[in-house]
Each structure stands twice: as structure tokens, then as C-alpha cells.
Amino acid sequence: MTLADIESFAALSGDHFYAHMDEVAARRNPLFGGRVAHGYFLIAAAAGLFVEPEFGPVLANYGIDALRFVKPVKPGDRIRVRISCKEKSLRAAAGYGEVRWDAEIINQDGAVVASYDVLTIVSERAIPDEVA
């Protein structure tokens, strides 16, 4: 996580909250003590670490539940994601299932910095290469 990453996300999202953009003001915040990454940037960056880009059984993401930003991520920190299947439910009449994934974003020290459930819609059957 670089300062340039944080500033690029601010420019893209329009979120210029002082804790992301103003070092002096961010140091005054007792929760951060300096500039930090946007929580929503962490979620987006984490998706890039676990989402398979090729066509496959996952049809769509449809939500996030129980999102908590537990610990700030600062410029220079590194993140990784731990994800595991938490719950599966079949919607047979619809031809798909719903999968709830337990996700944790973890920093270079092994501390959880964010936790949440990712909700996905997954095909019940393999989808043919050619759809008529």
C-alpha cells in the first residue's frame, strides 16, 4: 500500500477525507496517528487478490455483510487475504446457488485489518462455451 495508491484512490473515488490526504491533520486523529488507506480501497484491493478473472462458476458478487475495519492500514503496509467458504445455499428453481465467504484482510504483521462476508451468486451447473 503506497501513498501514491491512496492518493490515486482518492482521485478516482472523490473521497478526500483528511485522514487519507492530510498528514498533519491525520496525525491529530488518535485512531490513526498519520495518513491511512481508505477502507473501501482495502476491500477493492482485496478483491483483486482473490477474484478469479477467468469465466467460471461465479456469476456475480451481490453484497458484503458484517464489514468491519479493525485496524488502520498505513502507507508502506502490505496486505493479504484469507478467504474461506462459510455457507452455501441452492436456489434450484433459479438455477444458481448463493455462497457466503468469510474474508479477512491481514497486514504484514499478521493482524486482521478488516473482516467481512462476501456474497456471491454461483451457477448450479457448468455453463457451455457457446450459449445459443
Which functions belong to the PLM regions below?
Residues 1, 57-66, 70, 94-107:
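Hydrophobic transmembrane alpha-helix bundles
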Residues 1-37, 122-124:
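Catalytic strand-loop segment that frames the active site of acyl-thioester-processing enzymes
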Residues 28-37, 41-87:
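Hydrophobic beta-strand-centered segment that forms part of the acyl-chain substrate-binding groove
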Residues 73-78, 82-132:
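HotDog/MaoC-like acyl-thioester-processing domains
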